[in-house]
A protein has these predicted regions:
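ATP-dependent adenylation/nucleotidyltransferase module used to activate substrates
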Residues: 1-161, 172, 181, 188, ...
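AMP-forming adenylation/ATP pyrophosphatase catalytic core
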Residues: 122-128, 134-377
Length: 377
């Protein structure tokens, strides 16, 4: 059923091993390099150029055809444009989740299927599905389930939590059952040691080697305003723009006996409210308001309409038990009650929901609920 597989080749070790394993399995493998960003930073550096050269090197070595797919315009509209608008509104977005939803598992998936004749696509993500790493357990009558990768540290289901079930049904994750260390050893064993040695890219792809503060300042107008102590109402410093700061971040304010941390941003007044101390109780809440959920496999609720599941809003943080309750008739708005309070719940980020090893999907965070101190009062 699945003969031709188009691999998203990035120039890194994960997609290199993915392509090699698919070829060893006898698939008709085609490579596709996604060009999503084409600007060079002020130092003249563009990591995408080297990645493209490495992708060509891999496909020559494996003797598979390679095509460059250009999604630069779409990326600007669907990902980067939304990214800037969110920062201008005072919220903190997650461009990696948006890229997977709109580009890799939407436009790229459709391109591979319609233009390259793919029966399925494959990527080097650390994730799994119930259909198996090579879709060997595919069942057109069964629902697709997104499962965590076996490498707890590298698991990428958090970033895949907004993709469509239709695309996921025809996606292979060959390295999802491997750890990063195993992938690198495998690469070295099969003659792909150059890719195993390549430094792993970290952070937001379009920022490159620049500091995020310098980068974002190129696109959003600097508008200075006040840092205000939320407890006292006093101005304690000046900021250079709301977009430079996110909830929970340490505020750089000189001359203070105790460090301040960002609590809230008032866009209309261009004010950042801060609180004293990283463990200030106002930064902690056990309630979260979310909207517009995307369900990969919509879970069943309990008889009282409550879903018991696991929650995280940062992919490196431990999962927390929670109760999920719909707060609108159409299910577009929900309320999350956490079993234990968390610090710095950030508007614009995503609440991702799990049960055991399955990732159900996610919803965008609108705002945190009141702090535990307020509720206790």
């Amino acid at each position: 059923m699945f003969k031709r597989v188009v691999v998203g080749v990035s120039g890194g070790v994960d997609s290199a091993v993915t392509a090699y394993m698919l070829k060893q399995k006898g698939f008709d493998v085609r490579g596709a390099f996604m060009k999503n960003w084409d600007l060079i930073d002020e130092s003249g550096y563009c990591s995408g150029e080297q990645d493209w050269l490495d992708a060509q090197k891999l496909c020559r070595q494996l003797r598979i055809p390679l095509e460059e797919t250009n999604f630069v315009k779409d990326y600007w509209l669907e990902v980067f444009g939304s990214f800037l608008k969110d920062y201008e509104k005072g919220v903190t977005p997650n461009p990696d989740i948006l890229c997977n939803r709109h580009i890799k598992f939407n436009l790229f998936y459709k391109y591979a299927r319609e233009k390259m004749g793919a029966d399925a696509i494959a990527t080097g993500h650390y994730a799994r599905t119930n259909f198996g790493p090579f879709l060997e357990q595919y069942d057109d009558r069964a629902p697709i389930r997104l499962l965590a990768g076996v490498d707890d540290i590298k698991d990428q289901t958090f970033f895949l939590s907004q993709i469509s079930a239709d695309a996921l049904r025809r996606t292979m994750f060959p390295i999802g059952a491997m750890t990063k260390a195993q992938v690198k050893r495998y690469a070295a064993d099969v003659g792909l040691e150059a890719f195993a040695r390549k430094k792993e890219s970290m952070g937001i792809c379009f920022v490159g080697k620049r500091s995020f503060q310098d980068f974002i300042g190129e696109y959003i107008e600097t508008k200075p305003g006040d840092f205000v102590d939320f407890d006292t109402g006093k101005v304690v410093g000046m900021h250079k723009g709301l977009h430079h700061w996110t909830v929970g971040q340490k505020a750089k304010i000189g001359g203070c006996l105790q460090p301040y941390f960002v609590f809230q941003k008032d866009v209309d007044r261009n004010v950042i409210f801060v609180v004293s101390g990283t463990d200030h109780p106002l930064l902690v809440t056990d309630m979260v308001y979310v909207e517009n959920p995307v369900w990969i496999n919509k879970p069943e609720r309990l008889s009282d309409g409550v879903l018991r599941c696991l929650f995280r809003f940062q992919h490196t943080k431990p999962l927390v038990h929670c109760s999920l309750i719909e707060s609108s008739e159409d299910g577009s708005r929900m309320f999350v009650k956490l079993d234990e309070p968390l610090r710095a719940i950030t508007p614009g980020q995503y609440a991702v929901f799990y049960k055991d090893e399955e990732c159900f999907g996610s919803a965008r965070i609108v705002k945190p609920g009141p702090s535990i101190v307020y509720c206790q009062r």
